């Protein structure tokens, strides 16, 4: 490994074990780890059901960014190179162990007015673009 580098790797099912070399993506890992079956049970359907979002992709991306930042902080203190390893399956295990909200599917949708303060409208070549506003503004990034 190049000295002084922070290296982040992602795998579908983990970096060790019999499935370490298998390729995969969020939907496959959701199915292989039982999330789709649990979603079907919660929704009252007979069989698996897809989740409403690619939660493993999103959460694992946050873990990758956090791991890279922590490795850089450690590198600033101690020097050296650091390797951060994350996997979709381990993220799924972590999320699974958080537990489930009873009647979580019965939660009412937010009305559009409730999110309006957090959305901005920007002009684009395709017309008005609506996006979530930045969560913070830093003096050096403006």
PLM regions: where:
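Active-site-adjacent "lid/gating" segments in soluble enzymes
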Residues: 1-139
């Amino acid at each position: 490994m190049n000295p002084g580098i922070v290296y982040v790797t992602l795998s579908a099912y983990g970096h060790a074990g019999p499935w370490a070399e298998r390729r995969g993506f969020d939907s496959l890992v959701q199915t292989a780890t039982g999330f789709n079956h649990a979603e079907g049970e919660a929704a009252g359907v007979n069989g698996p059901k897809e989740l409403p979002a690619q939660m493993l992709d999103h959460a694992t991306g946050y873990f990758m960014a956090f791991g890279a930042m922590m490795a850089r902080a450690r590198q600033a203190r101690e020097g050296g190179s650091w390797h951060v390893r994350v996997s979709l399956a381990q993220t799924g295990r972590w999320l699974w162990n958080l537990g489930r909200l009873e009647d979580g599917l019965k939660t009412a949708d937010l009305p559009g007015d409730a999110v309006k303060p957090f959305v901005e409208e920007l002009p684009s070549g395709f017309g008005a673009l609506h996006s979530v506003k930045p969560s913070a503004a830093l003096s050096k990034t403006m």
